[in-house]
Amino acid sequence: MQSPERITPYDTECPKNEQVEAMFNHIAGHYDRLNHLFSWGMDRVWRQKAIRMIEPFAPHTVLDVATGTGDLAIEICRHIPSVKQVTGVDLSLEMMRIGEQKVRSENLDNRITFMQKDCLDLPFADHSFDAVTVAFGLRNFQNIKLGLEEMYRVLNEGAPLMILELSRPVSFPWKQGYNFYASHVIPVVGRFLSQDAEAYTYLPESIAAMPQREELADLMLSVGFREAYYRSLSLEVATVYMGLK
């Protein structure tokens, strides 16, 4: 199995972060609809369950990494009353432009701001945030360990990192059903609806390549988190990870 850093959307010599930026800029207008479609609407449920895991920490400031179109940032503001400010960072300007429209429609533009930044080089001081979140974005990092180190760095002491990510089921028959769906359904439907064949071939490949469950929890511990654990969701097709600084 290839390392996640070697799995890229396009067959070019460009660095992974540049390819990921180009991919999301291209599919931004289709992203939300396809996200809901391919997850059978469960992506909303997964976000709500993930948010409940950081709510007890009553954060005031949250950094949402790989914020995309802002779905998680918006849900955080809706469901965690203590949150005063969410800063969303992403490589893709087109995704964040859609996010800005959604934020304005929710009258949350005084609580959510967007910045085009690389998660591997965050422009924030150490100990800047009460929580850091990343949903469906970790597998797109050019270097997952470096990304974890950066998110750890900007967290306050005792604060949580919450990662929500797609995962490969390991139990029968969910594993077999998922493999068929990921290999045959997602690429075909994604290519038809988004007009980007590579983007929805990359999706299942990037899920398969990234560290999961115990491996990712161990990686979180290795960069300094004093505690790391995870919870599987919906027949193992999604996982929430928590790391405490």
Curated annotation (Swiss-Prot):
An individual GO BP term: menaquinone biosynthetic process
UniProt binding sites for S-adenosyl-L-methionine: 69, 90, 118-119
E.C. code: 2.1.1.163
Catalytic reaction(s) noted: a 2-demethylmenaquinol + S-adenosyl-L-methionine = a menaquinol + S-adenosyl-L-homocysteine + H(+)
Pathway terms, separated by semicolons: Quinol/quinone metabolism; menaquinone biosynthesis; menaquinol from 1,4-dihydroxy-2-naphthoate: step 2/2
Record Pfam families: Ubie_methyltran (PF01209)
A GO molecular function held by the record: demethylmenaquinone methyltransferase activity
Endpoints of the signal sequence: none
Highest taxon, organism lineage: Bacteria
Entry keyword set: Menaquinone biosynthesis, Methyltransferase, S-adenosyl-L-methionine, Transferase
Coiled coil: none
InterPro entries according to UniProt: SAM-dependent_MTases_sf, UbiE/COQ5_MeTrFase
Top-level EC class as recorded in UniProt: transferase
PROSITE patterns from the UniProt entry: SAM_MT_UBIE
Family: Belongs to the class I-like SAM-binding methyltransferase superfamily. MenG/UbiE family.
Role played: Methyltransferase required for the conversion of demethylmenaquinol (DMKH2) to menaquinol (MKH2).
PANTHER family found in the cross-reference section: 2-METHOXY-6-POLYPRENYL-1,4-BENZOQUINOL METHYLASE, MITOCHONDRIAL, METHYLTRANSFERASE
Listed name of the protein: Demethylmenaquinone methyltransferase
Organism of provenance: Porphyromonas gingivalis (strain ATCC BAA-308 / W83)
